[in-house]
Regions:
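Juxtamembrane non-transmembrane "cap" segments at the membrane-aqueous interface
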Residues: 153-156, 244-259
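Hydrophobic alpha-helical transmembrane segments
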Residues: 14-15, 40-45, 84-88, 111, ...
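Alpha-helical membrane segments and adjacent membrane-interface helices in multi-pass membrane proteins
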Residues: 54-117
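Alpha-helical transmembrane segments and their helix-start/interface "positive-inside/aromatic belt" motifs
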Residues: 69-70, 135-147, 219-230
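Glycine-rich ThDP/TPP pyrophosphate-binding loop and its adjacent helix/strand module
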Residues: 142-147, 157-218
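Hydrophobic transmembrane alpha-helices
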Residues: 2-73
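Hydrophobic core segments of alpha-helical transmembrane domains in multi-pass membrane transport
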Residues: 16-29, 47-54, 118-123, 147-159, ...
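Short helix-perturbing small/polar motifs within transmembrane alpha-helices
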Residues: 112-154
Length: 259
């Protein structure tokens, strides 16, 4: 889902950068009162986990793959403020150190992958909890829906940006259908991964899951950090075996000639 350089023109790239920075700065300010040692550690570990997960592409159809975006997962575990900061850190590191997504497109990628996914993920999980009960099953099912919809809306955001500032003329209706279709499948994968990780965290350290209202915890904190580190190590080991097929955006871009 990383947008490369030259896909979106300079004015729109600059505008998305300003919107992203303004939104992220607002959440940084609101997070000042939330910062504690355990939250800093948890945010760092979530950033590392999502960073590794974004490197692992899973196949969704013949010749196409997808990977976790992580916005919904981050806000469910960390809350909206620290969640959006967590994903922003991941996107910036990927752009600056690994050239994953163009530097001139950093604002676009921050908006789509950090801001949109986090805000949609938080809106969905918050609404889901109001409509249904506060139990673990509600949180887990809501996590799946939040993950799915966050990816779909991120793909729609890209099409809107391309409609305004795309550098190559394309049939926007067809591109929208192709983007949403492929990202519904990717979103299902995102929802499953999000639900599984949230389920694991609820079992190990339920008090550290932000959306969980029952903060009582009787689990050993050592088991939480141990499992978290082990999960990151295992994911790192399987990264070389991830799908090498182009992701949803790359596949659509190749089909319509705006890559």
């Amino acid at each position: 889902m990383h947008v490369p350089d030259g896909c979106i023109n300079a004015p729109v790239s600059a505008a998305t950068g300003l919107i992203s920075l303004g939104t992220i700065w607002a959440y940084i300010r609101s997070a000042k009162n939330l910062v504690a040692d355990r939250l800093i550690a948890l945010t760092g570990m979530m950033s590392a986990l999502i960073f590794v997960l974004q490197m692992i592409n899973f196949p969704i159809a013949a010749g196409t793959s997808g990977h976790l975006l992580g916005g919904a997962l981050a806000v469910i575990v960390l809350g909206p403020s620290l969640g959006i900061i967590c994903i922003s850190i991941v996107v910036v590191i990927q752009s600056l150190l690994f050239a994953d997504g163009g530097l001139s497109a950093l604002g676009v990628n921050l908006l789509n992958m950090a801001v949109v996914t986090s805000l949609i993920g938080w809106l969905v999980i918050s609404t889901w909890k109001k409509l249904f009960n506060e139990g673990y099953s509600s949180i887990i099912s809501g996590s799946f829906i939040a993950g799915l919809l966050s990816v779909v809306f991120s793909s729609i955001a890209f099409v809107l940006e391309y409609a305004i500032g795309g550098t190559v003329a394309v049939p926007l209706g067809s591109v929208l259908i192709a983007m949403v279709s492929s990202h519904v499948l990717i979103g299902i994968g995102e929802g499953i991964i999000t639900g599984l990780i949230v389920s694991l965290l609820l079992r190990v350290r339920s008090d550290l899951v932000y959306v969980n209202q029952n903060k009582e915890n009787k689990n050993n904190p050592t088991s939480f950090y141990g499992i978290f580190i082990l999960l990151i190590l295992l994911l790192t080991l399987i990264t070389p075996y991830a799908s090498s097929s182009p992701d949803g955006l790359e596949s659509v871009a190749e089909s319509y000639g705006f890559n």
